[in-house]
C-alpha cells in the first residue's frame, strides 16, 4: 500500500487539462431556496471560505458499464451547494476524453448520501438523482456532450424536480438508484418507499413497502424511548445496497436485522437476526458488495473496539434468495501512530473481487482520527474447503500533514537559516497550495504589523510568489525593542520570536490542510481495475493510478528492490546501503537540517586539512550525539564482517549513477503527467539524497573508529567521500530547485552571461523541459567541462518522462500549446523560458505575452516569425485561424494574410496601435491583386484605426470602402468611435462627398432613437450641425423643431429652465429659416397629433411655414410673460 502516497492527486489538478467549466443552475421548486444570510456574513472568513469552496463533504466515483465502453465520473459536493462532476474516462492512449467539467448549482444544500447515479443505454445519458435538505428530488439527464462542447445544447427537460407526498411528512435519509426511472428512499424515522418517475410528463407515483417482519406493539410505541427528540424507529434502515444482477435490495436496520428485499414483488424474502453490539448502530455504509459478480456482500459490525466483518454469499433460485455466511472475522487493530489515545472511527470500507474471481477478494477499510488516516486492507482467499484465509496490511497515509515534531533552534544558526528551513519544511510536503494561501490570508489579517505584500483575496499564485509573500509577512511581524543600554538589538530574542511565528504559521497550514484529509468514500471501477480513495480535497488510486503511468512502480524503489535479483553481485552493496539508510532514519528533522547545512559548507569550501579529520569532526558533531551507542557497536561489528565493502559500495554507486530509470517507450505521456513532473522529480531526488547521505554517515562512522581491521577494509574512503560529496551537491541543488519546473523563467535568462560556454552549448541541443532545466543549472553544479555520470543519468532518465518516442521532438512546444488552448495562461507564462527559437515556439511566446498584457514583447516576437509557420498549420491548433484566412484567399499573398491574422489577434487583446501597424503592413505586402483580400485588409484598418484614435487613417479607409457593401457598417463604427471619444468637430470637418446622404440618414436614425433629447451625445445637435455645414438649412431647422416637439411632449412641469430651453430652440429654428429665400421658408415635421399607423416605418408629417412657427414662438413668449408677472405679484404680496 505504499503506492497510495504516490497516487494522491489534489482535486484542483483534475481540471488542469480542461478548457473550461459548464455551469448549470437547476430550477427551484417552491420553498426550495435556503437563506444565504450566513454565507454573506462569513464571506470574509477565509477558513469558512476555504472549507466551502475547496473541501467537499461528499464525493464518489460512478462507472457506467456500456456496451461501447465505460464512462467514469468523479463527483464532489461542496458546501456552496455545488455538485462538481469530472469525466475521468480515458482514450486508448490513456489521455482524458473530456474538455470541460460540469458544475450543477442547487438552491439548497444536497443531503449527505443524497446523490445516486444510473445509466441509460438507450439514450447514452447518465441519470443523476439528488435530494436536497428542502426535501426536493431532482432528476437530471447528464449528457456526454456536456464534457466535450463549449456550447452544449440543453434540452428543456434536462432537469425535473419533484416533491413526493411522503417527503412532506418524513425526512429522507438514504437513497439507492434502481434504474433510470426508479429509486428507493428510506426515511430517518423508519420506512421505505419506491418512487417511479415518468420523465415524459414529469409525473411520479410511490409504492410504500411495508416491513411485515416487524410489528409495533402498543407497549413499545408508548415507551419512554419514543418520546426522546433523537428517537428513531427500530425498523429504520441505516444502510442499504442495490444488487442489479438479482434486482434485490439488501438492508441493515436498527433492530439488528439484515434483510433482502425482492424489488420485483416488493417483498422481504430473507431476514438474518444479528447479535446486538456494544456500540449503537447509526446511519453508516455498513454494507458493501463486490461490483463484479454482485454475489458477495460484506458487513461491518461494531461488536468491539475495532469491530468485525462478515462476508455473505447470495444464492438465488427463481424468486428465492438465501444469504449464507462465508466468513466471520474480527478486524485486526491497525498499526496506529503515537496518537493512539485519540478516538478512531471507521470512515468507509469496500469489498473488491479480484478480476471477477469468486475465490479471491480484497477488503479495504479506511480509519480516521483528528490527526491521521489509516488505510487497511485484507487479502481474502477462499480455499477449496470453503474456508477463508486473510492477510492483513496497512498504510499510514499522512501525506498532507506537516510533521508534528518541530526542531529546536541551534545556537549557531542564523535567522535567515531558520526562515529557509521553515520554508522548505512547509513546501516540501504535499500540502495543497490553497491551504497555504488561506493560512497566509488568516495570518496577515491577525497580524497588524504586516503591511507589505499583503494578499487582498484568495487567488492563484506561483510557488515563488507565495514563498516570497509568506517570508515577508512572517519576518515583518517581529518587532524588537533596543536593549536598555542602547548597544543594539537582542539578536537571540529576535531568533526566538521568529521561530515562534514560523511554528504558529506551520501549525495553521497543517490545520487548514487537514480539512481535506477525511476519506469520504471508496469506489471500485471494475472496467479499469482501479480503486478510488475519495478524500475531501484529494483523490488517491490503488493498483492502476488514474492518469499517472506506472506511478505505483516508483522508479527508485523499483531500482533498489530489484538489485538483488537483477545482479547477484550487488547483494553486499545493497546490504551496506540498507545499513546507511537505517543510520539515516535515526536522525530527526532538525538534525538532518543541521547536517545538510554542514554538508553545504563543505561543498562550498573543502577543508585544507585531512579529510579524515573532517569526517571525524562530522561524526562527533552529528552522528554520535544522535545515535544509540549500542546500535553503533552493532553497525561496526556488521561492517567488520564484510569481505570487500569498498568494492561492493563502488559497484552499487556506479549502478545508481548509470541505471536507466525509465525505458524510452513509444507510449504517449498524458498532459497531466507532464504537469506532475515536479512531484516525480522531487520524490526520486529525495531518495537519491537519502542514499548518498547514508553512505556519508557510514564513512564518518568508520573513520572515527580506532579499529585497524575496519580501517584496512575501508582504505581509500576519502576519495569515495569526495565523490559522494559531489553527487550530494548535484542532487541537493536539483532538489531545492525542482519546484522551478513549473515556475517562471524569464526569456532573457537563456542569454544570461552567468551561463558559461558549456551551458550555452548544452542549451543549443536540448529539446525537453527537463533537459533545459538541467542544462541551465549546469554552471551552478560543475566547474569542470566534463559532465558527471550522475548528472548525465538525471538528465537522460528523468527527461524520458517528456519523450514521446525515440525520435527527437519538441514536446515542450506541444505542452505549451495545449496549455494555451486550455486557457492556462499563468502556466504558459511559467514555461515560456523553455521555448526555443523555432518559428512556432516564437509565435507561441508572442501569444502568451499578448495574453499577459505585454504587447511590446508580443509584437517583437511576431515580427521575428516567418512564413515557415504555414507549414505547421496542420500540426498546431493555434495556427488554425491563420490557416482559415489563407484558405479563404486561395493561399495567395501569404504574408499579407499572416499580417492580417496578427492584426486581428492584437485587436482582440486591445493592442489597437500595434494592430493598426500590422494591418498597414498587410496592405503594403500584397504581391498580387485580390479584391476580396484588399477589402478585408481595409476593413481591418478602419476598425483598428478607429479603436486606436487614428481617425485620419480611418477616414482614408472609409472612403476606400464607400463603394462596397461594407460601407454602412464601417460608417457606423467610424461615427460611433468619433462621438465616443468626443471628436464631433472632427466628424463635421471630414469631407465625405460620396457618403453625405449615408451620414445624414445614419445621424437621423440615431436622433429619432434617442429617449431623452437632453442626453449626450445629442444626435439632434450633431445632425443639425452636419446639415448646417452643407447648407441644408431647411432640414437643419426641421431636425431642431423635431427635438423641440419631443421635448415639449415629454415634459410635464414647465419651469424657468424648461422655458429657456424652448425659447432658445425656437430662435435657432427661426434664425436658420431666415437664411432661406422667403418662398422656401417652410419645413416638414412629424405630426404629433395624429395616431401612428401600425406600420412603424410610416410617420405622419405636416408642413409648417415660417409664419406658423413665429406664431408658436409668440405664444411661448406670452406664457413666459404670464409666468414672470405671476412671480412678481407673488413677490410683492410677500413683501407687503
Swiss-Prot record:
Instruction: Give yes or no: UniProt keyword Ubl conjugation.
Output: no
- One of its Pfam families is NUP120_helical
The record's InterPro entries line, in alphabetical order, gives: HEAT_Nup120 (IPR056548), Nucleoporin_Nup160 (IPR021717), Nup120_helical (IPR048884)
Domain of life of the source: Eukaryota
Q: Which UniProt keywords apply?
A: Nucleus, Transport
A GO MF label: structural constituent of nuclear pore
Which compartment or compartments is the protein found in?
Answer: Nucleus
Q: Name one GO biological process term.
A: poly(A)+ mRNA export from nucleus
Using the UniProt record, give the first listed, main subcellular location: nucleus
Please tell me one Gene Ontology term that the record gives under cellular component.
Answer: nuclear periphery
Quaternary state and partners of this protein? Component of the npc107-120 complex which consists of nup85, nup107, nup120, nup131, nup132 and seh1. Interacts with nup107.
What role is this protein assigned?
Functions as a component of the nuclear pore complex (NPC). NPC components, collectively referred to as nucleoporins (NUPs), can play the role of both NPC structural components and of docking or interaction partners for transiently associated nuclear transport factors. Active directional transport is assured by both, a Phe-Gly (FG) repeat affinity gradient for these transport factors across the NPC and a transport cofactor concentration gradient across the nuclear envelope.
Q: What is this protein called?
A: Nucleoporin nup120
Give the taxonomic lineage as stored in the record: Eukaryota, Fungi, Dikarya, Ascomycota, Taphrinomycotina
